[in-house]
Amino acid sequence: MVLRPLVPAQCLGWLPLLGGLAVRDALTPLVEDLPWRVGTKWPNDVVALPDDPAAVPAVPGWAGTRKIAGVLSELVMPEAAAGGVARVLAPDMVPADRDEAPMVILGVGVNIGQAAEELPVPWAGSLRTLGAVGTGSGPDPKDAVEIVLTAIGHHLARLVGQWEEVGGNVDASGGALGRRLREALTTLGKQVSVQAPDGELGGLAVDVTPALVLRTQAGDTEVRAGDVTLVRMEG
């Protein structure tokens, strides 16, 4: 999907989380009668969490959580027309129109019809392994592809529209969008370890800005990229 949202460039970091929320909203109806719920995981995963963690084999760093989808984004800055000069916007400026706005290529991958033995890692899951498709009660995996794609497009358009209405600030106008993002984010409130580009950091995940805010013994710090795993607390 190609998006040119009318928000300041400094707010574009929210887009992968918004994309994850759109996927979560699209998949939730498919599992509503199953012992699973769908959430997001910072920075760009969509996961299924079991109602009864003891009923699912635990995977180190993931417990009973299973990754069922992921969101990737790539930023492309606007180019000048032939013979012209591209206008450079300040990070806090809203583009006047979509031609002036940076282009964000959003890629979404959803595990739909894979059997357990077809999944690449122990912490992966699919709509099939959750029991949402191909079980007789749910849609056929081929039909589910169209259902999921249509729903993701619908929810993403709605969320991006709400995001534009608040000028890219998810905590503006009462903060309803920010609350939804945080409520869906399963990372918050957990002791985690982040393998960041500059090393490993551990702490309590307390917020997103959209960077992940970790509370450590040295104070709060923001992590802008990295792989997150759960830390098992002893005792």
Can you name each region flagged by the protein language model?
Residues 1-2:
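Structural signature of FAD isoalloxazine-binding scaffolds in flavoprotein oxidoreductases
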Residues 7-9, 13-37, 48-235:
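Long, positively charged amphipathic alpha-helical accessory segments at protein N-termini or as interdomain linkers
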